[in-house]
Curated annotation (Swiss-Prot):
Pfam families: DEAD (PF00270), Helicase_C (PF00271). The gene is MSS116. Residues 1-38 form a transit peptide. GO terms for molecular function: ATP binding; ATP hydrolysis activity; RNA binding; RNA helicase activity. This is ATP-dependent RNA helicase MSS116, mitochondrial. A motif (Q motif) lies at residues 87-115. Its main location: mitochondrion. It comes from Candida albicans (strain SC5314 / ATCC MYA-2876). It is found in: Mitochondrion matrix.
Amino acid sequence: MLKQLSRSLGIRSSPIVANLIRSKQVCTRGFHISLVKQNTSSKVNEITDITSDSLKVKEDAAGSDLPSTKTDKKSKSESFQPVKFEDFKGKGYIHDSIINSLHKNDFKELTPIQQKSLVPIFNTEKGLVCRAKTGTGKTLAFAVPTLQYAYKNRGKGVSTVVLVPTRDLAFQIEEEYRKLISHLKYNERPNLELIIGGQRTSFNPRRPAEIVIATPGRLEKELQTDRKLAKCFSNVTYRIYDEADRLLDVGFESVLNEIDGLLYKVRTTPKPIKSLLFSATVDEAISEFSKKHIHPEYEFLNTVTKDDLEIPENIHQQLIECTDGIDKVNVSLSELHGIMKQHNDYKVIVFLPTKTAVDWFYEYITNALDDELFELFSKPPRVFMLHGGRSVRQRSAALKGFKVAKKGILISTDVAARGIDVKDVTNVMQMFPSVEIADYIHKVGRTGRAGKKGKASLFATPAELPYVSLLKRKRKVKFQEVIQSEKLNSSNIIDQIESPLDSTKEFLATMVGYLQQLQSAHRLDYDSLVIENMELYRKLVRDDKAMLESRILSRIGKGISAHVKRRYFTRTRYQSHDDAEFDSYSDFSRSGMSQRPRSNDRSSKMTFNGRGKYGNNRNNDWSYQNKNRYNNNNNRQTERSYDSDRKSHNDWKYEKKFEHRRIRDHDE
């Protein structure tokens, strides 16, 4: 009896075994089957081909109406076109508990992108690439299907990974998920976890979250270093690339390739990961990336029609042509003053290009408000700042404060240009051109959300007008209003506000590098840009002959004409700042650019040698080693330490002691 049973089992299984041996896409180890390359072929597994062949034989023989999965899903999705979330009830797509949660969050009507993408996301087998404009509800388009899967598969490890370019976007997506999860029964709630840079990961491998939102760099590190955590990703079903164009722009492609390999390395199921990619633009780079990470024959869904404008009509775009950099700051301050004076409730986002620019403008505005230089008829606004140099806690607090404020001004770098969904933003002000032309569109998209009216202002000097021409030619941007600054009754506010010397210097020093990026990106006149901004610097510090140290030009000032260098840059070291402050003028990390390379020796510190240059002394701390030595009060030291020729043993000992004290005081 047993012999006959084993013989029959061997006969029945032999075709499957033979097919497995012939297959190049599967490898066998014991009774475990796993795919080596999940997304490189439309035939995911030849076992499924055997099953479909057997079904086809049965259909031909018996004339039955067994469904062909692919066509049935397609016809089903074509016949079912939901308009409201209620339409999903009884259709088997979304659980009633999640639909009720959507209603409690006031999500009732589907946005156009949700109408077009929700059902295809549920039905897709090859993965989906979706072109969608910002602010159209795409987050909910992937949040609902992934939450539905996590709801049905609680306690089975990570089922969804959402990859985003910035921490701020991660917080925004987390908030959307939390809204939906909070209205589910406590024992039915899927777990949610953030794995992002700048904060400690609280992921618990014993009770892994079903949904993980991550920035690429941090997720790669965790998957490489924590085996227990990596095992929790063995059954990932959905992988979301949100703001994919931004992910590639900032150079995350190699990291995403590594993450892809790490996920498939720990994978225990033969099924491929369903990858969904969302992007405002789909160019050749996105297409090649999608073929590699989604599927060679990925499904493409375009929710942006030819008639759709990149910037909605409810946003009033205004171009203010300024005479120079000084006029630009003056007019922008007058514009802010007008908003504060004329409106009871308002939210304004002011975009600046570098971290030091944000620091300076924040201090500049708060000083003006504290001194009551703006004539206001009501309570002054709350002012917040946001940039990559702030901690996660500070950035989160700034965003939350700005969201709840009735009157608020957010001063930010490009980190707030994408993925930040703040309701009721009335005005967006861009004071400088963006390196990426698409960033203009994203910044403008922070206002006029959910169909409400908004106003976007761009301030441009004569040297920056070619950038405006590029916007019109490449992105079909149409300004409803073009104003010359001379026609505005702007008061001379810039003379009434005292600009902090240190932050002003840092702002203008790092701007030199940013202006070079603009020149190379848009072919602007570098000399004219530098002259405009250096004249602004002199106006702010109230010194008609103020100059910046030419040392900052060693890496970021190439291309400036000799006469401009002589006019605005000097080799003389200003004595009004100590060494650490002087160094910070060229600290690119504060401006959002790459950091200055350091020596491989961790103990090495930069030193200023006797020739007036900076060397790499591996043992000394940052110190000024010229003949003239200055203490913290910027006065010359006593003759004991100022002797430029011979010094006794006691003199050197005294100087060493003084140097340590100076460094210690600076660190404190």
